[in-house]
Structure formats: structure tokens, C-alpha cells
Amino acid sequence: LRSVFPEPSHMGNYAAILLPVLWFYLLNDSRDKRFKFVLGTGYSLFIFMIFLTQARTAYAMFLGITMLMVAGLLMLDWRRYFKIVIMILSISLGIFFLSVRFINYIDNIGISKDIIEPPKISAVEVVDKNLGSLAGEDKRSNGSRYALLKAHFRMGMESPLLGKGTYLNDSYTKDYFEFAEKENPGVKMWIGNQNKFGILKYPIGAMNEYVERFSANGLMGLSAFLFPFGWILYKLIWLIKKKKCREYVCLLIAVIAALVVGANDSLSVVYGLWLLLGLSYAVVLGQGSDG
């Protein structure tokens, strides 16, 4: 997986766009069975790789998108979609347990059972490791990540309307860490690398699109950035209520999931968000004056 994604969590970011699209085609009644079999195989392989990443972002994105899709489809027409939703959820759960067994198998290759009992990880431990650690400030990389978010937020609060300026905010970040935060190993590494390589080569971004835009452009810049997305989400919800169309549900969830990516990384990681935004505007404006 690292040969494709240098950061395993990016697998979850790309899932934000791909999973709603796969669900849309799996739910399409007009597709022939061979096409659905190939698509179902691809879906199974993709979520198998998500589970193999052992990345919190990938797990959280998959769980969140799946819950949104299930809720959206059942509210749209639960009688029509109940059986296939249960089938897809069952397949996903089965693949999760298969991935746990596969991880145990890979981890124990080369370990002699005569010398030492091979370590095993349970499904509960996998869930706790990758989802239970999301909120804890002292869990895994959360300490440095939260410190970075707080530093950018403090910076933004000094100039809440207009911010510090695009690209300038990354240069000032190290000055907004508190003393205790500078003792974090991750923060120490960032500051050390910036001192060594310089600001241009090693800027310290916020790992959060929205906090970074707030620190750079203030509330005015952040509001201007979010307005097109807010408008299109409102129009898609309006279309779903009016036309009860599965396509709009999948598109709405894809846009929401892609926006969630910005809460844990830069939106430039998933350029597909801009394609989704353009597609959404084409769908909404293409309805004509009668909507």
C-alpha cells in the first residue's frame, strides 16, 4: 500500500470519493449481474486494503461514509434498499474479520512456534487501536497534531477577520506553540527541521484545511471558501427531498465526505473534491428553473 500511498491515511481520503461512487453502481438496478460481480469484487478488494492500512483516518472515513450511506438510503426508501444494504454491510464485516486474520498471518511469518507463541491481535483490539484512539490527546500522533491545530488557531485569533496572510501563517507557526507543546517529539522535529532547512523548504502547515485558512485568511476568507460548498449542499438536500433520487444521495455524501478530509489534512490531497463540486453544480443548475 505504501508504494501507492506514502501516507496510509490517504487511503481513507480517497475512499471519501470512491466509496459513494461504488455504492451508487452497486445499487443500480439496470446493471447486468456480471458487471455487478466485477464491481462487487473491486469494492471488496478496496475495503480489504483499507483495513490493511491500520490507519485511523482510513478506518474512521470508511465507518463514517458507510453510516451516512446506510442512513441516507434507508431514509430515502428503506423497503427498496434494506436487503442490499444488509448484504453490503455483511460483506464489509466479513472482509474486516478476514483482514484481521490476514494481518495475524503476515505478522507471524518467520516466527517459529516451537520457540515462542506467535502474537495475535483480535478484532476488538484492531477497532480500539484505530478508532478508540481518535479522541485521546495522548494517543499515537494526536499530541503533535492537536498542538499544531492550537498554534494555528491562536494565530488566527490575533487577526480573526483577515488572518496573517496566505503562506505567511506557516512561517509564524513555531512562534505560537506553548512551552509544553514544544516538548512534544513531533513538534520538536518540525521546529528543528524548519530551523535546519528554512521556512520555504519546510513550512509547518496545520494538517487541517479549515484551521489553516482561518489563520491565513481569517473568518472572511474561510467564509468565502466555504460558501460554494454550503450552497451546493443545501441545493442537493433540497433535490433529494423533492425527487427522492439515489444519485443525489450518493453525490451529497461524496461531497460531505470529501469536505471531512479537510478536517484531517489539506484538501489538495484529494483533488477530486473540485471535480465533485463542479459535477454538483452541473447537476443542480442543469435541473432548469423548475428544479
Predicted feature descriptions by range:
Residues 2-18, 206-209, 214-221, 267-271:
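Membrane-interface micro-motifs in multi-pass membrane enzymes
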Residues 2, 136-150, 154, 158, ...:
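Long extracytoplasmic/lumenal interhelical loops at the membrane interface
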Residues 3-77, 83, 97, 227, ...:
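Alpha-helical transmembrane segments of multi-pass inner-membrane proteins
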